[in-house]
Amino acid sequence: MLLSGGDPPAQEWFMVQTKSKPRVQRQRLQVQRIFRVKLNAFQSRPDTPYFWLQLEGPRENMGKAKEYLKGLCSPELWKEVRYPPILHCAFLGAQGLFLDCLCWSTLAYLVPGPPGSLMVGGLTESFIMTQNWLEELVGRLRWGPAPLLTPRGIWEAEVTRAFGALVWIRGDQHAGDLLQLPPAVQELLLSLVRDAAGKEDIIEWLSRFGISDSHSDPEVLICPPQQQKEAPAMVSVGESPGPFVDMGTLQNRGPENSKRLSSLGATGSLITAQSTPQEAANQLVRVGSNNQDGMDSAQEEGTVQATSSQDSTNHTQALLKQRQVQKIEDKLLFQPPVSALGVCPPWKAWTPGPAFGPLWPGAIAATFWRINELHSLHLAWLLSQACFNFPFWQRPLGPIQLKLPGQNPLPLNLEWKQKELAPLPSAESPAGRPDGGLGGEAALQNCPRPEISPKVTSLLVVPGSSDVKDKVSSDLPQIGPPLTSTPQLQAGGEPGDQGSMQLDFKGLEEGPAPVLPTGQGKPVAQGGLTDQSVPGAQTVPETLKVPMAAAVPKAENPSRTQVPSAAPKLPTSRMMLAVHTEPAAPEVPLAPTKPTAQLMATAQKTVVNQPVLVAQVEPTTPKTPQAQKMPVAKTSPAGPKTPKAQAGPAATVSKAPAASKAPAAPKVPVTPRVSRAPKTPAAQKVPTDAGPTLDVARLLSEVQPTSRASVSLLKGQGQAGRQGPQSSGTLALSSKHQFQMEGLLGAWEGAPRQPPRHLQANSTVTSFQRYHEALNTPFELNLSGEPGNQGLRRVVIDGSSVAMVHGLQHFFSCRGIAMAVQFFWNRGHREVTVFVPTWQLKKNRRVRESHFLTKLHSLKMLSITPSQLENGKKITTYDYRFMVKLAEETDGIIVTNEQIHILMNSSKKLMVKDRLLPFTFAGNLFMVPDDPLGRDGPTLDEFLKKPNRLDTDIGNFLKVWKTLPPSSASVTELSDDADSGPLESLPNMEEVREEKEERQDEEQRQGQGTQKAAEEDDLDSSLASVFRVECPSLSEEILRCLSLHDPPDGALDIDLLPGAASPYLGIPWDGKAPCQQVLAHLAQLTIPSNFTALSFFMGFMDSHRDAIPDYEALVGPLHSLLKQKPDWQWDQEHEEAFLALKRALVSALCLMAPNSQLPFRLEVTVSHVALTAILHQEHSGRKHPIAYTSKPLLPDEESQGPQSGGDSPYAVAWALKHFSRCIGDTPVVLDLSYASRTTADPEVREGRRVSKAWLIRWSLLVQDKGKRALELALLQGLLGENRLLTPAASMPRFFQVLPPFSDLSTFVCIHMSGYCFYREDEWCAGFGLYVLSPTSPPVSLSFSCSPYTPTYAHLAAVACGLERFGQSPLPVVFLTHCNWIFSLLWELLPLWRARGFLSSDGAPLPHPSLLSYIISLTSGLSSLPFIYRTSYRGSLFAVTVDTLAKQGAQGGGQWWSLPKDVPAPTVSPHAMGKRPNLLALQLSDSTLADIIARLQAGQKLSGSSPFSSAFNSLSLDKESGLLMFKGDKKPRVWVVPTQLRRDLIFSVHDIPLGAHQRPEETYKKLRLLGWWPGMQEHVKDYCRSCLFCIPRNLIGSELKVIESPWPLRSTAPWSNLQIEVVGPVTISEEGHKHVLIVADPNTRWVEAFPLKPYTHTAVAQVLLQHVFARWGVPVRLEAAQGPQFARHVLVSCGLALGAQVASLSRDLQFPCLTSSGAYWEFKRALKEFIFLHGKKWAASLPLLHLAFRASSTDATPFKVLTGGESRLTEPLWWEMSSANIEGLKMDVFLLQLVGELLELHWRVADKASEKAENRRFKRESQEKEWNVGDQVLLLSLPRNGSSAKWVGPFYIGDRLSLSLYRIWGFPTPEKLGCIYPSSLMKAFAKSGTPLSFKVLEQ
């Protein structure tokens, strides 16, 4: 969500309907809270049905709120969504935070119902976004936790801690359920909050983000704090000045409300126990502090005395001064201040409250780090460690003490970028009481005091049954540099003092380590933020006189003790333990009881706090030199000279001493071992089951010695350096490294503890001194100018990481960057880029040798990421996003030691994982590992090389295999739950692997080194089961003999490539001798074991040396072995030679040399163990193998293949690449199968369900030869033909294009133009020529011509110019400003000549004689004439020639006609498809078949038949047996079957012949073609439902009802459709982000269309152009996005076509899409297709359609309608959608059908008038056809919200059918464009305007 100050507030007004006003009023408060805008409603007039809403706030917030209100007032969808009830806490927990964030993100109206139910409403997009989010949430519920030691496990640990802190802050009764959710679910919820917070600081955002409570006051949630303080009740406690509390005026001022305050959970809000949440929201609590006069401002009844010998007199007097606080009755009473983070009540007793509403305490800013970056650097990490590392119900009931360093940042994990700890402005916290006692409050304020040592705030986590106090001790050690601001707890003190607070506590820690006394004794990981700590003790300076502020337990007991603050000057060498308890009697001083022990350690210069375990008591006696002992929780007694700590009642020890006179506080359970531990000697060793302890020496060695980070050490008086055993609940981590180890992995239970070491400090040379000395060594960046290695990757260097590592994490060493650049430059890299943020370039004492950066910047090798400094805060962009983006786009590697965790879970996860190159420095030596990705990964040289993408994928494929479900033989048998299949099969694979190992062991025991016949049989069956398909002409015996060692799983490694054919062996492998005998002998030859066997093998091979290529080279190693007869030794070299000879002979005998005239067939089989590929050709009906290969596949333990099911494409790609030498560019027919070895029983294998083998379809997608070349190969492979189409580049040209800027002074320039217009019901045409020649004056010519078409006029001008000026000695150039005629002469004329002057539908082109005449004229010239297209139509020559053309068309010139002696070209139109069988079509209709049978048998129809009323008019044709109908005064016509009726109407109504005429004219023409019952009504319904009659016939604001031409419950193709929008996906090169899937469930036809915008209009346009234009609106439309989405799509169709108002017919059905079974397989392949093709997926999408059509066993829609199949002569997959291809096939069929019907009706006509009408209809249909060269207008569908409009005119460049045309100039001007349906076209109007090309309207 936006920052409140990010954008200036703005206002926006919009209207909603009045009926929605109550709904808006109910949701007004929620809108203001979630979107942080102000919402007001205004009624304009009482009589208007609308009212105004005013939004005020940031613009982005207003935009979101507006969309939310639109969905609220006019919801498009309102539906219940179900989910697992376990996720119910995600919607109600955290006080509604996640629900509000989900509402912010999706803008949906969300109403949680019972567990497992959520009502979702709003706009369609909002509903879909919510539904998708819920699906992902439910999907993540099944994710199991990752192993702890894996990167994912480390990440999940971070997520769990962050989530725990968030739940802690927003705690309610659902907190326990939230914390039990899987880490993946928690991660998604955290990302939801992160996205909602946006760029705003998460802490500030949570402070302003209210609680989802319908009873809370909404105005408080949105008003600033100053607006909420209305008449505050000031309650001052203590003397002035001091901490004060401002309480907002309570709405209920009853005495009960004013007496008590209850703390609800860990909210930190002070509210009354009985006050309502609304009252609580109005309360304002402000806690301040004052440190003047050294006065303690919190004065309470009771006295406490303390003395110190080292303080000054005035301080002593001030501290010894007794203070008394007047009893406060009927007023608010406060306990001593407690940190808000210290409260840990049991969750079952957690009272929900307005946790952190508009005025949540600022101290929580230190408890929760920035969730949007997930950097665990703040105290919430400590908190989550303390309370969330074990189940919620098992958290410690005892107090948990934490420490927050005041001016120190917490230790950093090296895997994260360093972040500064946010200052703590304030802190509030209640201490939970069993009796609901009121809590305390403290203020954390920024009081930077450089002259005073940094403070450490000791925070306490105490359950609701404990009293809690807080303190600040000064001079506590810290690690790391201080911050600029120090949050301090202040409770008064001496002048200049920071103040201190005293609290009762169970655990104590000094330094930055938390103490967790748990009931189970488990050590809890605290992130390594502190030293070692021991619960039960608290250290304060020994010289202190520390009277502490005691606690007020109840309102009824106001007596308190008070302790003054410490003096400002405190020594750091001596510390004492101070433990306090609370007396029951108000005025009785505490009696001394058994003292506690204190452990100390010393060092000379660097000292560290050593925390110990002591009881919690209060000092009463000033000086006690001797040490006193008392039972403590597993604490050893200190030395005899250890300073004594005074002890009061051991309130927190489970077994308190009997001598304690003061009643103890409620007992707190501690570790049983701890409570029962006796006095342990100091030398006693620590038990191994205790938690890990602190290695102080390591801590000291790893802490950076800075001037500000001095560390103090407890100094004893004798036993210096001795350290006692630590509590099992203690965890201490020392440094950043330990933080990295245990902060992420957590502490292990039972981990061995390191023995304590004696601390000694020495004054050796530091690393910083060594670094500065190294800088004195000169270094120069010398980048040589020699060319580098072009095969190396780009290197992207993380400059900050390299510089900081070389600078010891303290200096930004630019020399380190230069060394890294020099290292890669020397290796040959010339593409090196260094990324450095801008602020590192500024002058800074930590930036060393910046001149290296200057030089790199001058060499264009330095990229500076933008950043800025505002108010001392660095605002920088994320450098790693730049690095990852550059590495992704350039295929480079990233040099960094960071793990880039933020990107590891994004789409770049795999890329980032495989591109990181770690490094280190050894002094001034830059070093990188030789195996960057591990010892199993590539070497450094391979890592730095540019990879071959295909080789990389193939390499990955050959190393991995996917485990298929045992029950399926192929991937296609996976059902919807296929994702769980591989997981379930993993145990089975382990069993198989174990059985395999057992079987191998048994075989080895039975006989090693011997081959038995039984084993050979097993191997044969194994091979048969692996390959499944019998290898053609390659017996398994031969294949087995080619492997030296028989693998137990049958995975052979064989490679047979064809060699030169042997002349004396005859035809290879003809099944006869000598081949059969040779192979039989060869199969028996095994590895020679002695000299005799080797000699026999050599003799055998020598007899066939003529058949083996390179025989001498192959046999060389074996010949040399023969010479070593006495002591010969068989080694690897001889094995390879032996195998090479056998393979060469088998290849010569079994393989045929490839024939380039025959197509190849490639069979690829992928089994669980091997990849087998066979390349063969068919000749004389037999398969002849060309090449063979078999490769074993290595198992992958993690089962991580390239992609799910993605192995097979890589297998085919590898086979094609492997056989490329044999294949070349010859077309290949691909076949792919997936073998399964789950069973060897052939009956079981045959009994399995035959799958559709979607992997077979995938095999068509991997030939990477370019789209056109691949198209040709696929065409030949699918059609089984061996005829290559002529490429366009090799076609002969008849004109040549004149280059631009040519000198026209040496040319005969012929300016030409044609003109055509309509006058007095007739066409007139003419052309003009204006000729300029360097040897003669200009010539002007005008001609008239016929036929009267614009294309003919232009062509006639060209022919006339060639006749008159073609024989000129000078070259001739034709100049025209008509783009159409230029494209015709240059591009189309050669293509038409190659086609035989036929269009794509097989019909003759217009004017073939004129085209042939022009070709003959150009071929007779010595050089081809030139053509040139002028760009300016208004030039003098263009205007002149246009005028001449008009004169010629008007009859003002000569008459030009084609010479009569020109031979006409032979044009042979061919019919596309076979003649339809009319009788078979009728018999395919069961109703007509029954009527024909009854007529043949002489029976009558039943009364229920639709033909019963017309039975007497039905008859059978005597010749053909066709069923005919004879109506009154009508000719006999054919009875049309049911499946063809709608398409027959289409052929009359929609094509140019019908031109969308009225129903009466359509019925009149259709009646000449056939008849069926109810025909006239059917025609009326069709014309009424025709969408494309709208732009022609719709008048004004007429309402258009969207109807379907299909009857209800129709099962015909295209009558029912299913649609789904998939995405967003990888953005294509054209900008497509989504994919529209359209499926016909009846025929299982599926198609996908790329989408740029995901809108109803975009989907409607695609459906209009590709589906509805040919097949009409379906009667049933199912959408995965919901019924409302489908309705909007159809309404958008009507609006896009020009209707003013569109409504939907009641007959249309919009059910919910319950099953995607029709296209789930296609959808799965689509995702992998996009993954495989990357950004080119949209352009390559036709490949996916073609692949699925090629091997689909389902009947196509065309086959369902006609009963047969049709093939197209041209490949149209790239230009047309599959729906239009099916329509094209249907158009061809209907054209043939109409011709057959006209011939049939003319033959059976009884009257001459009937025959004449038949011929007239045939002639008229031919005359009204559109031909190539005609001009038409196109209906351009709306763009950017505009309405549809007719644009043009455009020329028809080609005709595919009567309803599909290829348009020239649309959508790309001057190019042969897309294929357009005739329903979106109309003829250009007949007028006097010239029919010339117009640019497409924008």
Swiss-Prot record:
CDD domains: KH-I_N4BP1_like_rpt1, KH-I_NYNRIN_like, PIN_N4BP1-like. InterPro entries: DNA/RNA_pol_sf, Integrase_cat-core, Integrase_H2C2, KH_N4BP1_1st, KH_N4BP1_2nd, Rev_trsase/Diguanyl_cyclase, RNase_Zc3h12_NYN, RNaseH-like_sf. It comes from the Eukaryota. Residues 1304-1450 form the RNase H type-1 domain. The keyword Transcription regulation does not apply. The chain crosses the membrane at residues 1372-1392, 1408-1428. This is Protein NYNRIN. Residues 1609-1774 form the Integrase catalytic domain. GO terms for molecular function: mRNA binding; RNA endonuclease activity; RNA-DNA hybrid ribonuclease activity. The gene encoding this protein may have arisen from the fusion of a cellular gene with retroviral sequences prior to the marsupial-eutherian split. Sequence and structural analyses suggest that the integrase catalytic domain is inactive. One of its GO terms (cellular component) is membrane. It is found in: Membrane. Residues 649-672 have a biased composition (Low complexity).
